[in-house]
Regions:
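Pre-Walker A adenine-sensing motif
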Residues: 1-15, 248-260
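Pre-Walker A (Motif I) flank of P-loop NTPase domains
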Residues: 17-22, 261-266
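Conserved P-loop
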Residues: 21, 27-91, 271-322
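Short, structured coil segments at secondary-structure junctions
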Residues: 43, 153, 171-174, 288, ...
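Phosphate-binding/switch loop-helix module in NTP-utilizing enzymes
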Residues: 84-151, 315-366
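Phosphate-binding/switch region of NTP-binding enzymes
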Residues: 156-215, 367-424
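Charged, amphipathic alpha-helical linker segments immediately N-terminal to NTP-binding catalytic cores
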Residues: 194, 198-242
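Extended amphipathic alpha-helical coiled-coil/heptad-repeat regions
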Residues: 262-269, 296, 312-424
């Protein structure tokens, strides 16, 4: 199943009867075309995609999911000669723009029978060049005519542009969004900036998004109280160990990314994201019948009890002093959580961790970004960095090395489940 997600502000922007223009700006490779295809797919065929650089056959090969979502009749070759598919499933009739009236008539011909029509032009710069309106004054006249046309005919037009600088079109357009693709510690990071959406409230002006599987998917801020909204909480079937040496993280997606947890697992960075992941492990381990040991006690563990089998709810202990932890390392294999931010004596921590590893217990250690690097990572079997990006909890692996992944909380099953999506 293909999962789309467009920011709710943009969905609201298109969900009325008025004609308007949305200008989508971004450098090559920033995701403009995928965003446009995803949006048009969500509109259930009420629109047309005018491309000047990619023919429909190639587009279907690059984005296989759109063949079942967007009909060939709605993909228009705006600059090339007539193309007929070899299998003769469909014919693409080109639109030859020699002047402004013909250009507008061609658009109107594609939309006059549509309900709430939407036209996507990729790219506006190429179309303007093809029409021969190279002078700045002529281009501005064309853009004014296009704005007037869309309002008179109640047509919504989405213009894709690679010029990220501010131009007169920014003022004419009803909405302006900018897509960014930047490097973050040698990893891909994608953001959408909602600069203007006339008539719509912008709740979050910056949206983290991914193009995973060639689909545009934006992420929303995680609600801190979302778990409390579960009406009938109940335990879920736990995920078994990965192997004799690796246990499950309690998150299926994270298991696939890092292969589970080893003996010492270091989390470095932002605490709230770490806490989300630690709670997932706690629930899974408890429902497998394992015991947990915390140093120090974490108050938020109490709210996990509704999701734990009653017979396992007493399998939790706590110690307040790291030195007391050595005396508790005996007997069955346990999972031990250590907040190293609250411990000053680094050598004692290392000694305790070494003893725990020898016993075969699993250690989950957290430290802030300022203190973590270089202190414990040299003997970590897993090293995960935690962060918040545009209000979204994210992780990336140092050992093993991974892309940035966005975390989402799914409570639809009556149990908090974490899903990960790579930012690619």
């Amino acid at each position: 199943m293909v999962e789309f997600r467009i920011p709710e502000e943009i969905s609201a922007f298109f969900d009325d009867e008025y004609g308007k223009i949305l200008l989508v700006k971004g450098a090559p490779g920033s995701g403009k075309t995928v965003f446009a295809l995803t949006l048009l797919s969500m509109l259930k065929g009420n629109g047309a995609y005018l491309a000047t650089r990619v023919d429909p056959e190639t587009m279907y090969k690059q984005h296989p999911w759109i063949k079942g979502e967007i009909s060939a009749a709605n993909i228009v070759d705006a600059a090339q000669s007539v193309r007929v598919q070899k299998a003769k499933e469909f014919t693409i009739k080109p639109l030859r723009y020699t002047d402004v009236p013909d250009f507008l008539k061609a658009i109107y011909a594609r939309t006059e029978s549509m309900e709430k029509p939407v036209i996507i032009i990729d790219s506006w710069d190429a179309v303007v060049s093809y029409t021969g309106y190279h002078a700045q004054k002529e281009r501005e006249e064309l853009e004014h005519s296009l704005c007037d046309f869309c309002r008179r005919t109640k047509t919504k037009i989405l213009l894709l542009a690679e010029n990220t600088e501010q131009t007169p079109l920014d003022y004419l357009a009803d909405g302006v969004v900018v897509l960014e693709s930047v490097m973050y510690d040698e990893r891909r990071l994608r953001r959408m900036l909602l600069q203007k959406l006339r008539g719509c409230q912008i709740k979050n002006p910056v949206r983290l998004f991914s193009l995973d599987n060639g689909i545009f998917k934006s992420f929303i801020e995680l609600k801190e109280e979302e778990e409390k909204e579960i009406a009938e909480p109940h335990p879920r079937a736990p995920i078994p160990d990965i192997s004799d040496r690796r246990i499950s993280t309690g998150i299926e997606d994270l298991d696939r990314v890092i292969g589970g947890y080893g003996t010492f697992n270091l989390f470095e960075g932002e605490y709230i994201t770490y806490d989300i992941i630690a709670r997932a492990l706690s629930l899974n381990a408890l429902n497998l019948g394992r015991s947990l040991l915390f140093m120090p006690w974490q108050e938020q563990i109490d709210r996990l009890m509704p999701f734990v089998e009653p017979k396992y709810r007493d399998n939790i202990e706590a110690v307040e002093d790291i030195k007391d932890l050595k005396d508790r390392i005996a007997g069955e294999r346990r999972i031990i959580f250590i907040n190293m931010e609250e411990i000053e004596d680094e050598e004692v921590v290392k000694a305790v961790i070494a003893k725990i590893r020898d016993h075969g217990d699993v250690v989950i250690g957290f430290t802030g970004a300022d203190r973590g690097r270089g202190r414990f990572d040299f003997f970590a079997s897993t090293h995960i960095r935690t962060m918040f990006i545009s209000g979204v909890p994210c992780v990336c692996g140092e050992v093993p090395r991974t892309e940035i992944h966005a975390l989402e909380l799914d409570i639809s099953t009556g149990n908090p489940e974490i899903r990960l999506t790579p930012i690619v």
